[in-house]
Amino acid sequence: MAWSITNKADTSSFTKMAEIRAHLRNSAENKDKNEDIFPEDVIIPSTKPKTKRTTTPRKPAATKRSTKKDKEKEEVEEVVIEEYHQTTEENSPPPSSSPGVGDIVESVAAVELDDSDGDDEPMVQVEAGKVNHSARSDLSDLKVATDNIVKDLKKIITRISAVSTVLEDVQAAGISRQFTSMTKAITTLSDLVTEGKSKVVRKKVKTCKK
């Protein structure tokens, strides 16, 4: 065990060895445990260097990957097409013995046109049938509409005729009343002209019974 004297203590006042020994003994008993050269209880911190966290790069979007893959596929397809053209040009016979590419293209186009014309004929027939069917359906709808209109007009005519007959009856009754009143007036007038005075009608006087 190592002994040490610190500068904090003032040793100028010690005159005897016994006092020095007592002071050393007290300092040894009251000293901090961490002052030992090889302390057992003190935990020595690790001296590992601090490592920074590595930030993982974000994954690119799926669209970018798809575009890259599409580009790679296109490049591969272009390379394959170029190789195929090169091999066909190398293995193809001279133009005198085989028909030209333009002739082949023209023949294929002519065949496609013939096929398209043949396919167009039934399509035209189908469209004509559709037009005829639509025209017939339109005519049938128009006929139904006209029939309904005629029925409604007939109903209106019957109602109007009924109203007119009722009005004629009322007017006839009024005319007959006016005619009767007119005839009464004419008779009174004729009596006044012929007799010169109106007829006196004696009224019976009611007698009260006692």
UniProtKB/Swiss-Prot annotation:
**How does it get modified post-translation?**
Phosphorylated at multiple sites. Phosphorylation is necessary for cleavage activity. Phosphorylated by the viral B1R and F10 kinases.
Bias regions of kind Basic residues — which residues? Answer: 49-68
**Gene Ontology cellular component terms for the protein in this record:** host cell cytoplasm; viral envelope
Q: Does the keyword Signal apply?
A: no
Query: Which positions form S-S bridges?
Result: none
Q: Principal place where this protein is found?
A: virion
- State the residue spans of region: Disordered: 25-102
Instruction: List where in the cell it is found.
Output: Virion; Host cytoplasm
Q: What does this protein do?
A: Involved in the co-transcriptional or post-transcriptional endoribonucleolytic cleavage that generates sequence-homogeneous 3' ends during late transcription. Involved in postreplicative transcription elongation on intermediate and late genes. Also involved in DNA replication and in multiple steps of virion morphogenesis. Required both for inclusion of virosoplasm into crescents as well as for maturation of immature virions (IV) into mature virions (MV).
* Family the UniProt entry places it in: Belongs to the orthopoxvirus OPG110 family.
What is the official name of this protein in its record? Late transcription elongation factor OPG110
Organism field: Monkeypox virus
Give the gene that encodes this protein.
OPG110
